[in-house]
Amino acid sequence: MALATPLPATQAAVKVTGPSTVDVSAATTLPVLEAFEVLVRVACVSINHVDGKSADMSPTPGATSGVDFSGLIVALGSKVDSDEFRANNNMRALSIGDRVFGGVFGNNPLRHDNGAFAEYVAVPARLIWHMPAAMDFSTAATIGATLATVGLALFQYLQVPMPSTQTISDSKTIPDPQQKTRMALVYGGGTATGAMAIQVLKLAGFRPITTCSPGSAARAMHLGAAATFDYRSPTCGADLREHTANGLELALDCITDTASMSICYEALGSAGGRYVALDAFPLRGHTRRSVAAEWVCTYTQFGHAVAWVPPYNLDARPRDREIAEAWYVVAQQLVDEGLIEPYPKEDRTGGLAAVGEGMRAVWKGEISGRKLAYPIAEECY
């Protein structure tokens, strides 16, 4: 293992202590670094809805919480340098001192020592992004989970063709006129994941349409939505079907409740299509046999089982890992070329000690239209 400097014997980390409760442990172990992982000194973290939700519905006492992070690489696993994946895909090699960002599996029953809300986090070397020179740690910490989730949802579960690094360089979109006219619905375009999905769909050559509040419509259009629809309208589903001439085939549901599922199903054309949710959807909402319905758990990208309570107990999905690795290559280019616009954020103080309060606020729905970011290590800035 290559090290920047000697590592401390212990670290501070936000630990799950019970249902919906977390606390900072001042002296817990660092993650055990696996051969194909890098160890990151966490500079900044951000809060996702899943952080509080998972601590509520499937708490793992003693597990480190948190998904999104940015920071500096301080150690390389024993096989990182010999892995040719990044070189074969024209990605920068990972080196000690590199500025990076991404997401990990926090509150993991199978790995208590690893999560983003800590001073150090271990990350697969193939599933981490370099930060562009002009990007700050706070912004980078808000991107990882949404970028990974959208990639897996679109290119694995909705089966959207993934753009290659070459097609991005050539035209910034897939150069297929028919593909460019194909529409896809993003339900919840005002959310962080919805905003990311709109951008990625447009870059993949689609015409994204979205549901959102009137207050979020202008931003959705700015990001690339071809049209927006007020999800509160009683005719929202019918309006979507009319707008798409009864031909809509793809719907990504970033909200996932009975109301959102009903509108998506009404919007999909009479020939059916694919519906992908970002959570386990209510089975009573699956009302059309012509619609293939699936849901995404981004943690399957790591290639291991998810050992939460049902329905979140999932076997390992090797194909998800394959798609994720391919997507990280493409996404790195999108980030490098400034083609991804980050979601609005609010920088907060207090470090790890304040993260628990932010988790609760996001989980309770008290935060809207922005992500909360918390600097952790001032020496990284």
From Swiss-Prot:
Keyword presence, NADP: yes
Pathway membership, UniProt: Mycotoxin biosynthesis
Top-level EC class as recorded in UniProt: oxidoreductase
Residue sites binding NADP(+) per the record: V50, D51, G52, K53, S213, P214, G215, S216, Y231, L278, D279, I367, S368
GO biological process assignments: ilicicolin H biosynthetic process
InterPro entries from the UniProt entry: ADH-like_C, ADH-like_N, GroES-like_sf, NAD(P)-bd_dom_sf, PKS_ER, Trans-enoyl_RdTase-like
Quaternary structure and interacting proteins, as annotated: Monomer.
Protein name: Trans-enoyl reductase iliB
